[in-house]
């Protein structure tokens, strides 16, 4: 048997028996064992289809429809927009903890039908299609959770079906959210009743050839452009640190482990077939120095897979967090020794991130991200670091390392804001490069094929035989090897740790060009347009001003209370003046577009550009005054200094200080520098506030410098719901 066939035989590995909640023994997951079979099991293209690729797709997430929502109800926590009198709008209570009224869902689908439907190639739908369990008076039940999911699935199918209503015109790729099950966050290993229900609800979306795989663990993929691009729907609930029903990705008996093995095998097959992949899921692999959303072992494997299959993976796309942002995976955070069992992984100082981020929690999280971004090393460009491009760095044994021109040390994950109006409802249209693909045969809604039935009858013993035949291969890449050795820590004696049964995927061939995540080419993400619905304008609510209440609040309220008050919505909980709702016409409008955003300056969505953006967001004003330059002598150092000065002008702006002197201990996330002509002291100033509207010590107004790209990023993170002056309080 050839080595390539042995490698492909890995498709049958690690799909052993998992006990279901009812004690039933599931069948093995059918996975293609050779390239021909894999190609035959996908939806076949229509040779003469009139439909062409547009180079766009829709990402929609966290709809949270709530059948109990009532307009003009109270936004208090005890009422949750279900009862009482208050400012809940017809289309939702913006900037609150209330869920989405059906009116918002219907209006969103109407807008998509009128403005988006005919211009996109596929839909990525990243879960949470049931309301939160936030009202003790109306607890959730399975019928409600499944009912709203079924309703939205039917609306999706109806919207994107052909004139007969029997076939989808474009593929829709859903995934499970942590609120799409009961109790929320907890999903036991499959097969189970939840996966069985969603197999039926999503029968139009999950390819028949992978139906059994989905029933087994809730993961699958769709070739949205046959033989060119696949969307992988990951069941991130098995990676989620708050899922008490499973235990991460370390043990072969865990569904998280099995899913990672499935993903590794499928990405290998994608590489062999010359295909690319977008990875999507609900819970993102968010991770800072103190917080995390995924189990650490799952995060480590996922990051390693991204690195080793960087020629295949285009990007990661996620939801859940409601805030618009991104994060960057650094290969130097990968601990292969830990994954291989050569290092202690029992100590992890990172705490599980809050299930639902408050404004304060989100601000803290974004500040930590910014701290991490300050450590990034942007890839060299023609105008900067030209010396690094030519010389390179000396690596192990004195060998010169090639400069990382494309930023392949890093990987990218994008997180979109939500439909549920925790801020403003939002959705995203992402564009990708279709150069040379304009006439490519497109996806079609395929009927059940005989091949899927045949795959389901694969013999379990054959899987085990293939597993035994495949030789363990450990990656010999210098950097991976160094990290492995770094993880080896055994004390005393001549005993050596047992060789682990851990397979590290092969990286791209050294002769391979950078993938679409790094170098502009077909299937590279070129940009996106972020849309939002300004519910403050659309709901058109005027509320009563209760001066007595406001005076009391302003006198007693701390800054923490002020931030938490946002969760009651834009209007607090004041009653509307007009008894009957009078909303304006519902519309989504452009919040920003990466194609023309003058501060983000993203030429496309390649990793290199995002690393540069993250680094610019992290920059702090320099202490001291700029040194004068002798124009009579131009050296490389002076040119570099001039470039730095231009960058300073580009990144920072002078703003008036507030009348109030804010007190806070020094930290690394200071965003302002005092500009005082009468003093030589130039210290970075940090901002906070001790009490929201209490009297404070007054000081003479001055000017400070702040990073306008960071402020711009924060504005979009909260979907333009927070005024600039208030954003300063978060920084």
Curated annotation (Swiss-Prot):
Keyword Transmembrane helix: yes
Sequence ranges of Basic and acidic residues compositional bias: 457-474, 492-501
Top-level taxon of origin: Eukaryota
Claim: Nucleotidyltransferase is one of the keywords in the record: no
Compositional bias per record (Acidic residues), positions renumbered to this chain: 636-686
UniProt topological domain (Cytoplasmic) ranges: 1-4
GO term, biological process aspect, one: polyphosphate catabolic process
Compositionally biased residues, Pro residues: 505-519
Chain segments annotated as transmembrane: 5-25
Entry-linked SUPFAM superfamilies: Metallo-dependent phosphatases
Keywords, sorted A to Z: Glycoprotein, Hydrolase, Membrane, Signal-anchor, Transmembrane, Transmembrane helix, Vacuole
Family stated for the protein in its record: Belongs to the endopolyphosphatase PPN1 family.
Role, per record: Catalyzes the hydrolysis of inorganic polyphosphate (polyP) chains of many hundreds of phosphate residues into shorter lengths.
Record-given protein name: Endopolyphosphatase
Lineage: Eukaryota, Fungi, Dikarya, Ascomycota, Pezizomycotina
Gene encoding the protein: epp-1
């Amino acid at each position: 048997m050839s080595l390539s066939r042995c490698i492909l035989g890995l498709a049958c590995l690690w799909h052993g028996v998992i006990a279901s909640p009812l004690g039933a023994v599931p069948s093995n997951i059918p996975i293609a064992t050779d390239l021909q079979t894999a190609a035959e099991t996908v939806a076949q293209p229509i040779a003469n289809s009139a439909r062409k690729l547009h180079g766009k797709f829709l990402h929609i997430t966290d709809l949270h429809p709530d059948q109990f929502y009532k307009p003009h109800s109270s936004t208090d926590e005890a009422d949750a927009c279900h009862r009482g009198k208050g400012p809940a709008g017809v289309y939702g209570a913006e900037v609150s903890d209330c869920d989405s009224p059906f009116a918002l869902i219907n209006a969103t689908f109407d807008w998509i039908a009128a403005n988006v439907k005919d211009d996109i190639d596929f839909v990525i739908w990243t879960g949470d299609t049931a309301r939160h369990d936030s009202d003790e008076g109306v607890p959730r039940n399975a019928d409600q959770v499944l009912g709203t999911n079924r309703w939205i699935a039917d609306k999706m199918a109806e919207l994107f079906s052909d004139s007969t209503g029997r076939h989808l015109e474009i593929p829709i790729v859903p995934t499970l959210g942590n609120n799409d099950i009961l109790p929320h966050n907890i999903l036991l290993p499959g097969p189970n009743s939840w996966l069985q229900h969603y197999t039926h609800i999503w029968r139009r979306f999950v390819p028949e050839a992978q139906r059994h795989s989905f029933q087994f663990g809730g993961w699958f993929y769709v070739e949205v452009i046959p033989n060119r691009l696949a969307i992988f729907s990951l069941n991130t609930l098995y990676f989620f640190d708050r899922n008490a029903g499973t235990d991460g990705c370390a043990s072969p008996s865990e569904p998280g482990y099995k899913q990672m093995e499935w993903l590794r095998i499928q990405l290998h097959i994608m590489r062999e077939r010359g295909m690319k992949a977008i990875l999507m899921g609900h819970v993102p692999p968010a991770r800072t120095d103190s917080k995390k959303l995924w189990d650490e072992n799952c995060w480590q494997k996922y990051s390693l897979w991204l690195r080793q299959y960087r020629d295949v993976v285009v990007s990661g796309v996620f939801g859940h967090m409601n805030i618009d942002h991104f994060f960057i995976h650094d290969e130097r955070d990968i601990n292969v020794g830990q994954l291989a069992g050569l290092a202690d992984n029992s100590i992890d100082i990172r705490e599980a991130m809050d299930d639902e981020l408050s404004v304060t929690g989100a601000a803290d999280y974004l500040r930590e991200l910014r701290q991490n971004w300050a450590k990034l090393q942007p890839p060299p460009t023609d105008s900067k670091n030209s010396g690094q491009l030519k010389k390179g760095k000396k690596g192990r044994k004195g060998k010169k390392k090639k400069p990382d021109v494309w930023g392949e040390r890093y990987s990218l994950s994008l997180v979109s804001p939500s439909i549920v109006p925790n801020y403003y409802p939002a959705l995203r249209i992402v564009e990708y490069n279709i150069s040379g693909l304009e006439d490519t045969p497109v996806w079609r809604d395929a009927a059940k094929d005989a091949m899927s039935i045949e795959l389901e009858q694969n013999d379990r013993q054959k899987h085990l035989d293939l597993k035994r035949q495949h030789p363990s291969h450990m990656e010999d890449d210098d950097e991976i090897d160094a990290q492995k050795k770094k993880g080896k820590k055994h004390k005393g004696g001549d005993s050596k740790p047992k060789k682990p049964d851990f397979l590290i995927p092969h990286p791209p061939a050294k002769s391979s060009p950078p993938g679409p995540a790094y170098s502009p080419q077909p299937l590279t993400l070129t940009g996106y347009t972020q849309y939002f619905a300004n519910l403050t304008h659309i709901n058109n609510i005027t509320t009563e001003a209760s001066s007595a209440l406001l005076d009391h609040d302003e006198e007693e309220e701390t800054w923490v209370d002020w931030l938490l008050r946002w969760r009651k919505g834009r209007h607090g909980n004041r009653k509307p003046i007009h008894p009957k709702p009078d909303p304006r016409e519902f519309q989504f409008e452009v919040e920003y577009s990466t194609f023309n955003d003058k501060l983000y300056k993203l030429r496309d969505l390649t990793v290199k550009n995002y690393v540069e953006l993250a680094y610019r967001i992290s920059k702090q004003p320099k202490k001291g005054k700029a040194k004068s330059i002798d124009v009579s002598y131009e050296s490389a150092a002076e040119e570099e200094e001039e470039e730095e000065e231009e960058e300073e002008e580009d990144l920072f702006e002078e703003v008036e200080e507030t009348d109030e002197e804010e007190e806070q201990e020094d930290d690394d996330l200071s965003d302002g520098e005092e500009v005082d002509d009468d003093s030589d002291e130039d210290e970075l100033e940090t901002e906070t506030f001790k009490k929201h509207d209490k009297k404070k010590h007054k000081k003479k107004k001055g000017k400070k410098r702040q990073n306008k790209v960071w402020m711009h990023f924060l504005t979009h993170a909260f979907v333009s719901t927070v005024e600039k002056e208030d954003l300063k309080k978060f920084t």
